[in-house]
Amino acid sequence: MDEVKYPVLTEKSIRLLERNQYTFNVDSQLNKTKMKIWIEHFFDVKVIAMNSYRLPEKGGKGGSMIGHPIRCKRMIITLKPGDSIPLFSEQ
């Protein structure tokens, strides 16, 4: 799926892994419903909650560019206890 760019590994996202929450950067046009269906189908897990937010915009450097470039969206996905995404397993 091209809309899911990559998993995020920051201090906050690593801390959230302990609470069974996974963080992904996704395309700015992707909505929660499509993401939930994709995660449940691809990883065979049960999603119980999703939070999303847009990353802060970066200012332009002048020139012919007007406004700000569209950046990606970040989604935090909470899974049912006992489920996990294999990308982050320690095996």
From Swiss-Prot:
GO terms for cellular component: chloroplast; ribonucleoprotein complex; ribosome. It comes from the Eukaryota. GO terms for molecular function: rRNA binding; structural constituent of ribosome. GO terms for biological process: translation. Pfam families: Ribosomal_L23 (PF00276). It is found in: Plastid, Chloroplast. PROSITE patterns: RIBOSOMAL_L23 (PS00050). SUPFAM superfamilies: Ribosomal proteins S24e, L23 and L15e (SSF54189). InterPro entries: Nucleotide-bd_a/b_plait_sf (IPR012677), Ribosomal_uL23-like (IPR013025), Ribosomal_uL23/eL15/eS24_sf (IPR012678), Ribosomal_uL23_CS (IPR001014). Keywords: Chloroplast, Plastid, Ribonucleoprotein, Ribosomal protein, RNA-binding, rRNA-binding. Belongs to the universal ribosomal protein uL23 family. Part of the 50S ribosomal subunit. Binds to 23S rRNA. This is Large ribosomal subunit protein uL23c. It comes from Picea abies (Norway spruce).
